[in-house]
């Protein structure tokens, strides 16, 4: 996979780099971001680990991490990535998406997903893109459903959270056959 920057007039998704550490630390320092995530960013060491792990996965070509930049302010406001990349079966997952709370319930996530999905289906020619979330993360489920993804089911006892409790995972997907309709839907939301 080529390391690319995706952007429109609202948002820029640029490949994560070591130089993004300060922006991620500032943007990710809100505990509410991490309540349903498998990682937490509270201090510089957490950011270092987050970026190191992401860059390692990028070098291994198993993930492609982006930072999310608000085009109006130029600030880093979150992160997302392509992960579980499977060339043989022409699929990947969009995941590890987080935004600083000031950008929750804005057009940013919709713009990000549109850019990622369009690239996945129209440039990578994938058959399937999946997105999954914690069953307790209702806000995320609503956001995924809002973009037009199909809820496939729940993976029971799928993960152990950082606090030791069991997480069930809600699985969503968009297939190549669904993409034209989802694309039209997203383009209406972006207007």
Could you tell me what each predicted segment is?
Residues 130-132, 150-164:
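Conserved catalytic-core motifs of GNAT/GCN5-like acyltransferases
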Residues 131-141:
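Conserved beta-strand-loop-alpha-helix junction that forms the acyl-donor binding cleft
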Residues 122-132:
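Conserved GNAT acetyl-CoA-binding A-motif
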Residues 105-119, 142:
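Conserved acetyl-CoA-binding loop-helix of GNAT-fold acetyltransferases
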Residues 1-106, 119, 165-191:
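GNAT-family acyltransferases
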